[in-house]
Amino acid sequence: PDDTSGCGHLAAAGVVFVFVAALNRLARQRGLAPTDGLPDIMPFLDLCALGTLCDMAPLHGVNRAFVRQGLTTMARDQNPGLRALADVAGIGKTETVYHATFMLGPRLNAGGRVGDPWIAARLLATDDRQEAVELAERLHALNEERKAVESAILDLAMAQAEQALARNPERGILIASGEGWHPGVIGIVAGRLKERYHLPSIVIGWGQGLGPVAKGSGRSVTGVNIGDAITMAAREGIILSGGGHAMAGGLSLEPEQVPAFDAWMVAHMAQFSAERTAALELRIDAVLAPGAASPALVDQVAQIGPFGIGSPEPVFALQSVHVTGVRQVGANHVRFIAEDAGGRLECIAWRAADTPLGQVLTNGARVHLTGKLKADEWNGRRRVQLDVGDAAAD
């Protein structure tokens, strides 16, 4: 409440960038600048953008400028560490929000989740190309380890979620817990549960060298403030401590407190049924024919970016298209072709193979689709695909 700066939306990376800019200005005003000049901080906009995106900060105000200009800086490959990390991730040009958020970010975070967080710091700071390659390869390996740990815990958490919903289909929150669940991935697993079931979700783990106290991480849907709920539970003595913001929170509690916490949260969340229903509503920005999707259209859409928290990417709808060539790729992704009399469009539904969405797609019937347009390079050819968000039988 005491903050009147109007900069409460800044991520830590943005705060540091603004702070260093202010130091430069103050040194210049007071005649303290060295004879060879003050350091130019603009080349560090790539790190500022990366931190802003990976912290899921809202993309408005100065954050939007940081990300737009920072991605341009990142594409110049001035940071040997980021270039090495992009190479091990199989990225050509690191110039999009997707690359930063879903390719570079998870690998940088992997050290802190399942290894040594200083590996990422050393990678971003080094000017030595060989050292950068070695550190990037270590982070890539740790990220693969993180994904394996996450997958195992997600399977257990989903089983608990299914059992909880079978007992009470009307419950407004999912809580899963287990001994030995790695604290570095419980937040990711909570996010996966939220995406799958469209419910606020909390995942709790203990052990793993943390001692007897359990740690939990929560993710929420729009309109349901999970941080406030966790704070209230802490004040009432249901848990040891906790807090957060509207979309995410963390907590500490004794393992023996989990059942009481679960019951308290279910009772508390009952009041938000209307908000949860509203969160399921899907806004469609435009209707698109499969044959109208082109690299030029993707480029036009990109001009109003960057997209992220607080600046959603346009959602397109394909009406009454026929699904052909359905196949599972990777662990559980579904790739297919959507076509009508006027053309066809490649589509992919991420992590959908064992979901109701996947079932609709594998039936091979006519469907209505929604999703976001993406373009990538493959064998020297630029192609467009629809990243599918939802589907309904025609």
Please provide the spans of the model-predicted regions:
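A generic structural signal for short coil/turn motifs at secondary-structure boundaries
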Residues: 3-6, 57-59, 184, 357-358
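A generic local secondary-structure boundary/capping motif
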Residues: 5-7, 92-93, 191-192, 324-325, ...
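Hydrophobic helix-and-loop "lid/oligomerization" segment in the mid-to-C-terminal part
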Residues: 25-257, 328
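Mid-to-C-terminal polyanion-binding domains and interfaces
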Residues: 131-135, 142-176, 210-212, 224, ...
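Hydrophobic, small-residue-rich alpha-helical packing segments that form membrane-like cores
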Residues: 1-15, 25, 37-40
